[in-house]
Amino acid sequence: IPAVMSGDVDCVIAGQSITAERAAQVDFSNPYYYASIVTLTKKDSAYANAASVADLAGATATSQLGTIWYDTCLPQIENANILPAQETAPAMLVALNSGACDIVVTDRPTAQAALVAYPDFTLLDFGGGDNDFKVSEEDINIGISMKKGNTALQSAINEVLSTMTADDYNAMMDDAISVQPLSE
């Protein structure tokens, strides 16, 4: 956001949730993606068969700094030992792989790439509803940020986004996952 506000970049496409706090600083496109919350653990973990957030009770957990996964989701785990937030997704995954934590909560694309890099991890998807983490639409709607008042850029981006289908977005996400460093 600071790079957008200073004019160093025109826009940022980086999995940013469109929150009221962020929208006070920058403008956003319409949402282009809705994040899915998942949990990663090791296949031999006591939590590997968890079917709900309640099943994660007592876990040592972490996630990435500045994310809803850390700020909103982890506190919902009863009696969790919440470690400090990790600076990056790779650091979060190293914490899990090294045994520093039992679980990490993240988004599906990060988790899917991690499964390629760490075959001893397993992905837990609680499928929404009562078994899942409780988040608002604001927490999971992802948009493109741009400098406040740049209505021409906002309109142009929204016009392009309006031509795309959910299948288009999912195909692009799959392509991005396949080429990111975690999946190599």
Which sequence ranges carry the predicted segments?
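Proline/Glycine/Serine-rich low-complexity intrinsically disordered segments
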Residues: I1-E184
